[in-house]
């Protein structure tokens, strides 16, 4: 099946701008907020959110990267050795950490991120921002900030393309799998 575009670059930009405003509003400013992108596509999304917050609030929000490769509960089914990225985190203590990811699906990625984050420190609070929430949760996890809710079937896949990673124009597409 041909991929169906659900969001274009302008719709993604608007959704991220709204999320940035919601983060600031929910936390009474951005002075104690850190953004942590989940490797891969959560990282550029976190950087974009930080830039948008800096633009309106004139505050430099620390941005970190979290690679959950060794914390996944499906390591045994992913092949002999996971490909690991890097984890670089700002100071966590007494800060609100907003985890950032592209798509929220079963909740297992977020569970792994929470487990790894707790190994690095204890923030005052953890919130979750996602560009797309597609439903079908297997764990009791809910995003605090959502760009767009997109109901999907189990045999569909939501793909996010970002210019920083995919060398393509930003888009969100849905693809039916066989």
Swiss-Prot record:
Coiled coil: none annotated. It catalyses: UMP + diphosphate = 5-phospho-alpha-D-ribose 1-diphosphate + uracil. It is an enzyme of class 2 (transferase). The keyword Transferase applies. Gene3D superfamilies: 3.40.50.2020. Disulfide bonds: none annotated. Regulates the transcription of the pyrimidine nucleotide (pyr) operon in response to exogenous pyrimidines. HAMAP family: PyrR (MF_01219). This is Bifunctional protein PyrR.
